[in-house]
Amino acid sequence: MTKEELIAFEEDIAAVFNEGKIRAPVHLYFGNEEEMIGVFRTIRPQDWVFCSWRSHYQCLLKGVPKELVREEILAGRSISLCFPEYRIYSSAIVGGVLPIAVGAAMSIQRRGEDSKVYCFLGDMTAETGIAHEAIKYSRNHRLPIHFIVEDNAKSVCTDTREVWNQPRLSFEGADDEYISYYRYETKYPHAGAGVRVQF
């Protein structure tokens, strides 16, 4: 998909959400389309993708038909989109996919398969203990996995750097075999689309 198509998809979901037609949380992307498209240039059909509750772009770029993604979102499953036939999983639990992604990478390594795991996590999740353990374990065992830290500076409604009282995040600027980082600004709040009140 193109940058314009990704943006149009999210804008459509935002409009439907603000009309009150989606009775569940949504977490929208904006401003990181070029970075996301760049990451997916290296992701192959046989590779696995794990993400958090914000995963619309990943699903679309992994090849899931946009009609199917939209259908799942309208059914209230935006924060837990899973399409095993396309090898993509997401979870609404903070850090929930990290140990699963590491386990998948270990399975690939032990079976000698020609595939790799790509795990997306936000800037706040990247500061948690499970993230540090998952990344260190993967490095130590040279697992076929790559972590992508997406920094939108949001820890729900508080700036991540303020929450942790640190001007620079642990993986800020990282770019190596196991982890990459990018920062972007979004026009959407942490959850929802900025009009309808959501709890």
List the model feature ranges, each with a label:
Residues 14, 21-141, 165:
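Cofactor-binding active-site loop characterized by glycine-rich and histidine/acidic residues
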Residues 13, 49-51, 70, 147, ...:
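Generic structural hydrophobic/aromatic packing signal, biased to beta-strands
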Residues 1-25:
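Cofactor-/ligand-binding subdomain signature composed of acidic, glycine-rich
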Residues 2-3, 16-17, 112-115, 147:
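A short alpha-helix capping/helix-coil boundary motif
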Residues 6, 85-86, 156:
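Membrane-interacting alpha-helical segments
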Residues 141-199:
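Thiamine diphosphate
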